[in-house]
Structures are given as structure tokens and as C-alpha cells.
Amino acid sequence: HKDLDNHKLDSIAFGMGIGDNPKLCEKVFRVQCEKIIDADAINYLAKNKDSLKKLKGCVLTPHPMEFSRLAGLSVQEILSNPIEIAEQFAKDNNLIVVLKGATSIITNGEQTYLNTSGCSGQAKGGSGDVLSGIIGSLLAQKIPAFEAAVAGCYIAGKTAEIVADKSSVYSMLPVDIATSVGNTLSSILKDKI
């Protein structure tokens, strides 16, 4: 991370496994490139809401507990009206929110998509990291942030469905999703899915 200022970056997927690292968060938030923010970086933002202003147009991928801390609402409040709350938060902060769940909500405050692809096998630690990596790779290919978030959620979910069909939701791991994304993309591009 010492060289962040010295390199041209297309995108950064950030926050997974960084722990409590305020200096690194602020350094990454200043880098001029597309960003997807997840996990520990979302927890940092929940305690440092002024830093949201540095992330205009970025993608945030909270699960309901992370989003409750970020939005200052209880998980129950979030789950009772997730679409409207995610839309308002995205609009107020000029961000793309991917509220992860069985049906993920992807919104920029103006447009909202509900992603129903996926399976219960994704409810494991590390699956969100895979999603962030997929979205980050799409951002690096210059796909606009909202479209990258929508496509990334679909690709991750569809890949998980395919992996679960070949093994089971009980035995699948996030690495199985990550290593199968290429086959899913190939099938999508050939209109087989």
C-alpha cells in the first residue's frame, strides 16, 4: 500500500481482511480510481461517516449488519424496508449500494435492481470477497459502476448456482465460485444462460 500514489490503477476492491486500519482506509479513499468497498472498510465508514464524501460513485457491498451500522438503523429496521432504505442511502451519499442477501438489492438511488440469482451456499465467509473481486474486475474493464455491480451480482449468483448443481450447497466453498466464474462468463457470452 506504500505505492498506491505512484501507480495508475483502474480499480480497487478494498476492505476484505484489513482489520482496523484507519490510515490505510483514508489512503485508499484518496486514490483516484473506481472503488468497491466491503467488510472492514465499511465498518470504518460506519465510525467515520465524513469519509463517505470521498467515495462518490463508488460501490459499497454491505450485508444487513454492516449496513445497519453504516445507516445508523437496526438490522430489523433495515430488513423491514430494505429497498427504500438502500435507495435513500445511495441517493444521499451518491454511491452504489449492494445490500447483500438472498435477494440482493443494487441501487444508485435512481435505479434499483433485485438480484435473485444465487443459492444458500453463498452464505459463507468469503463469498462476499468473491463478489467484490468480480465487481472490481468489471470496474477495471471500464464498465460503469452501477452496471458492474448489477452484472457482478448476477455473475456471482449464477456461478454459485452452477457450482451447487455440480456438488451441493453444503460442500461448496467461495473458492469454488471464484474458480468457476470463467466458465459462467463463457456460457453467458454464448447465450447459454
Predicted regions and their residues:
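Gly/Ser/Thr-rich beta-alpha loop segments that engage phosphate groups in nucleotides
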Residues: 17-21, 103, 120, 127-131, ...
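Short, small-residue alpha-helix embedded
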Residues: 68-69, 124-155
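Glycine-rich phosphate/dinucleotide-binding loop and adjoining beta-alpha-beta core of small-molecule
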Residues: 1-117, 186-190
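Charged C-terminal helix
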Residues: 160-193
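Short, well-structured alpha-helical segments that form the helix of a local strand-helix-strand
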Residues: 82-91, 145-158, 174-182
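Short beta-alpha connecting loops at secondary-structure transitions
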Residues: 71, 116-122, 132, 162-169
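Alpha-helical transmembrane segments in multi-pass membrane proteins
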Residues: 11, 15-17, 124, 132, ...
